[in-house]
Every structure is written in structure tokens, then in C-alpha cells.
């Protein structure tokens, strides 16, 4: 049976913002990606909030924030609680993306939208899959299966194939790349022929991409000229996606002696650079065949870089000799080390800035790409500095009050410690810094308590109310206090002290440093900066070009196409091209923001609610794996809010023109108006008020018995004559084919007519009626 398929666009249509879409297949709802843009627009969150409790599963296609950036917020703040599916690299690298993004923001501003704990909680819900692994969903998703296929854009990047009962095939393919690269193979399209629905993006639909060789030569020339001119090169990259391709390319160039770059430095700078490289080493099986062969034949891990230095902060980078090439995150230049280096290096004409990614319009990197002639720009300078003077005194006073309150609470707990024996066991361990280490071994005299596994019924305490530290025991002996074994912290070096004085601690230290020990605040100023360095955009996005996208869609030949994520001009161009290729065989949709697209294959399918009295009166006939029944009922337009419905095919639903609840002008047109109202309520705008989480579905009520009209029998599940022959033989009836006609006991002939219907011929005898009954049993008759 054909399924009801709808797509609601929450973000990422007719524009280049983050991707987030709600796909409904019958009663099951998928969230396709959960991205957030570089500016953390709350419009995306507001759209997601309306549907968050309807979502049954989340499918993540890529590990970058544009595809999963809003996931920690949705789980931590909106209460998203459902299965989340992603490949293993998307799970691991997605964490690296979000860790680096959080730390990059936290280093220069008071970032409170989500925390690292929210990131961990969100990624703990992810079910990790391998490519081509078929997952059959359960519960509301019974009959649905999902399969991740390689997209070729980033490591673990996925094209999702969703199949309903082996019939409806939905393909979600955004940001794919068919070309083979150094570290990734191209996308796999062999398993994606003739899908029922293709959801794809138009980001590159009108983009003419230079050849890879030309781009590599441009990059090498730019780097050589800058380094030989005693300048530094900043390459703005992402955290753990496309940076792997550039790191492989540059490390290979550095290994080539003819290039003459061995005397210069190459560095990777982000908050999680070490973890990114280590994860890459363990995921070689997800990469290109070339890297796999290199690893298997030479036993040499391709991510064991010879020339690439890993840096976690500006202090690490300062130890790398200049001139140097630095791969720094973030690609949008809105935050992170790339922004810090851009501000430092852009005013020196010797330096070069290379942008590798077209980020969302409105970001600094996109401004530089779209306006290459602009040499003066206003930039907000953000940094975190330590508190001084009155602010520091106020902060210390607040901390002192907090500590005093905590100390009083602790003393009150210790005063009540002798209320019961059990409270002595269950009391929490004191704060690490609350007590001073006294000795290594337990002294028997202390606390007047013996060291044994058995508690004494009677305790003795000092006569005077002097608080005394009590030694706590459990089944294994004395409870260990971690503070007794701590090594005293070393004095800060002069270098670290100077960094604290200059207020650069947050930006210069690795991510794992506890910044809460130093009282700080964030300040920002806006300055006009003259860009004297050379700024170049070289495409290393890893996406298919416009012509290739159109050829791929034409090769797949989808019956329906929904175009998302791209500027309006590119979406229109791709739609016109696909209509020209497919003609009437393809339906193309270009939804607007918050619009719901009805992509149901059969248009005469309605979703209604059945009354219990009607369901109990139905007589079902089994046909293969389904049960069918004929329904005569009245469509009640007084709608009821429900979450699910029953799907009825055209011909099985009868509207009563005399329904008193329907306000119509003429009774003869009542059924037409009822259908129009039903279609409006069923396939209209799903965007209701915030509190209306469920769809509004009309109710089908039973007709009075005296008004039920008769109908001709409908024969379904038509058998094949070869199968019917086996049935006759099992019943002891001789049957054989003679000229395509099944002859039974030499008295009855069963043949298929030119119209495809089965006819029964012969004399009216006992065998004729017996064979007719056996033939009827092969059908589902309603």
C-alpha cells in the first residue's frame, strides 16, 4: 500500500543556512539533520521546538555544525529523546567539531547555549552504524528500514536510503561528492536507481568548479610565494572534516624534495588537533582505497604525519618557527584560532590568507570571498581578560560568601553525624580542600575507634563540643581521601605569569586547562582593520559541481524530487534542468521555509480516524501479508486531534451527502465539498499553534444498517495459473497445460483472457463447482 510522505522544512531552504527537515512516512517522523548556523540563530530552534516531541528518529548525514550543531541544544534544552542514527566517524568527528566549537566560543565570550555535558549527553544517544548496514525500525517504524551509504564529502558522510515495506524508497542526499579524493572515495550511486523520492540540495547547482589539478597548483604557488617572501600562510579549515584532505595534501607536498618546502613549518591548530589525528588513524577503513592499500601493504598509517605539527593553542604555535603554514579552525573566521591569526596577520602584506570553504552569508569569511576588493572592514575584537581592581574584589567577596555558606552547611552536617549509625556510613566524603593531610596510616587511637570490619555498638566522644574528624570505614577498610595523595601544585613559570598579565591565558592554553581557577570576564571592541595580506579563495569543499549534480539526478531518475539548501537562483536552475530531463515522469518541488510538501505517490489517499464501532463491524479478508475490508461510512468533518490514522484507498471510502453536520448549499455537492475539506485538513499547512503538536484528522463513522448500499465483489490477489495447478494437484484433480490453457480432469478449462482476467469454462458438473471454489479461495474477496 502506498505510504503518506510529507516533508516539512525547518531550516535550509531557498538559502545557504543550516540543514534541518522533518520527514513523515505514515505515522513515523524522521528529523533529517539537526544543523545550526554560525550565528546560532534562534529561528531554527523555534521551528524545531514545535515538532521536537513528534520526532521518532534523527538521521545525521555529516559531522559538521551545519548538519548536527543544534543537537546538543535539542537534547539538553528542548528535551529531544529518540533514537539518533549516524555512522561511526560522524559520531567521533562530530564530537570533535562540537568540542572545538564550544571551546572556540568560550575562549572569547560568555557562551551559554550549550555545555560540553550537553554535547556528551547528545552523542550518548547516537546509534553508530557502518556503511550499507540495514537497520529495520520497530514500533511505529515497523516496515521501515534505513541504510547509510557513503556521500564522499567528509569522513563518514552519509546518503540515507529509507525504504518502506520494500516499495517506497526515499533518498536523502545532500552535500555529496562523486569524485575520488586523497582520503575519500566518491559517493556510491549504484544502489540508488529510480527512487520514489529524492531529497537533495542545490548549493552547487550553478557553480563552475575548477579542476582539482588547477586548484592544487594555485595552492602550491600561493604557499611558495608567501613562504619565500618571509610571510606566514593562514588556511582557514574546519575541525575534523575537510581538514583531513588538506592535511594529507600538504604533508605529501612537504615530503616531496623537489618542492623545496622542507625548511618551512607546517602546523595544525585547533583545540582538539591531537584527538582528531588519533581518531583519523583508527578510521582508515572508512577512507579511500589508496590509503587503505598504503596502510595494508606498507603498514604505514597515512595519518602518521612527518611534517605536520599539532598545536592546541597560540602558545604551542609560537614555538613553531616562522615562516609557517597554519591550518586553523574555524572556517568562517567568526571565532577560534583562525580569527585570532587573521587579526594578527592580515595587516602584513607578506602574509597570505587562504579560505577553503564558502560559509553562510553574513560571516567574515563569506564577506571576504564575496567582496575581494574590500580592503577595510569593521571587526569585533573579543577576548577574555582577568578581573582586576573593584571587579576582582567583588568576585572574591562573592566566592568567600559561597565558601562560608558551604562550610556552615558542612559543619551542620557533621554536627548531626551521631544521630544514627547509618548516617555515619552514608555521609558523603568531605570536599578535597577542606582538611589537611595528617598521616599515611590510620592511628588506632584517633576517634577512639578500632580498625576492624565490625562496627561497635557503643561510641565514645570527647567531653567538650570540639569537632573532630571521623575516620570512615566500609567493607574494604578505611575510605581513601584523594586529597591525601595530591602532589602540591608547582609554582607557575615566569612565562605563564606573563601570559596571565597579558590576558591571553584563555586563547593560548590547551582546551583541557581549567579556566575556572582564574577569575575572568569577556570584553569586546569594534575596530576598523585594513587588510593588506593577500586573501584567496581556493575550493576544497569536496562537493560535486553543478553539471555533475544534474547528470547524477538524471541517472537516478527519481519519480519525485525535493530541492533544498541552496540560493533561489540555483534551486530554480536545477528544477528547470530536471524537468527538461524527466519531462512528465518527474515531479519537482522547491519548498519555502516552514512549508510542508506532500510527496505521496498516490493523490487519492486520505488519512482518517475510524470509530471503534465501525472497526468492530468490519470483515477482513487476508491477502498475502495484509488484511482488507470494504468500508461504508460517513466522513464527519468535526475533526478530532489524534497522532495516528488509518489509511484508506480510493474506492473504499463513501461520503454521505446527507450528513447533517456539514454546512453546504446543495446536497448533491456535499461529497465534493467534503473531499475538499478533507484534503485541506489532511494535506494543508501543518504549522498550527505551538501547543498543537498533533495533526487534525477527520473521523469516519458507520452508516446506519438500512442505509448501507450493496457493492459488487472486488477480487484481489490474483493467482498465477502455474500456482493454481499445484493447488489442484494437491486436491487430487488432474491438471495440465495444453496450449496455455489449464485443463482439469478433461472437463474444465481455466484460461487467462487478453485483458488479464481468469475465465472458467466447462460443463456444469461437480468438478466445475469444486474447481470454482478452489479458484475463489486464491482471491481476497471483499
From Swiss-Prot:
| InterPro entries, A to Z | Beta_Casp, CPSF2, Cpsf2_C, CPSF2_MBL, Metallo-B-lactamas, RibonucZ/Hydroxyglut_hydro, RMMBL
Q: Which consequence is recorded for altering residue 67 to A? A: Inhibits histone 3'-end processing
Residues carrying Phosphoserine:
419-420, 423, 660
Looking at the record, which segments are called Disordered?
Answer: 407-449
Please verify whether the record's keywords include Amino-acid biosynthesis.
no
Q: Where are the transmembrane segments?
A: none
Q: Where is the signal peptide?
A: none
Locate the coiled-coil region(s) and give their ranges: none
Supply the alphabetized keyword list.
mRNA processing, Nucleus, Phosphoprotein, RNA-binding
Pfam families, per the entry: Beta-Casp (PF10996), CPSF100_C (PF13299), Lactamase_B_6 (PF16661), RMMBL (PF07521)
Composition-biased stretches, type Basic and acidic residues, lie in: 407-416, 439-449
Q: Which GO terms of type biological process are on file? A: mRNA 3'-end processing by stem-loop binding and cleavage
Q: Which spans does this entry mark as compositional bias, Acidic residues?
A: 417-430
Q: List the disulfide bonds.
A: none
For this record, the Gene Ontology CC terms, alphabetical, are:
glutamatergic synapse; membrane; mRNA cleavage and polyadenylation specificity factor complex; nucleoplasm; postsynapse
What SUPFAM superfamilies does the record tag this protein with? Metallo-hydrolase/oxidoreductase
Record-linked Gene3D superfamilies: Ribonuclease Z/Hydroxyacylglutathione hydrolase-like
Compartments in which it is found: Nucleus
The GO terms this record gives for MF are:
RNA binding
What does this chain do?
A: Component of the cleavage and polyadenylation specificity factor (CPSF) complex that play a key role in pre-mRNA 3'-end formation, recognizing the AAUAAA signal sequence and interacting with poly(A) polymerase and other factors to bring about cleavage and poly(A) addition. Involved in the histone 3' end pre-mRNA processing.
The family note in this entry says: Belongs to the metallo-beta-lactamase superfamily. RNA-metabolizing metallo-beta-lactamase-like family. CPSF2/YSH1 subfamily.
Q: What is the name of this protein? A: Cleavage and polyadenylation specificity factor subunit 2
Q: Which organism is it from?
A: Homo sapiens
Q: Which gene encodes it?
A: CPSF2
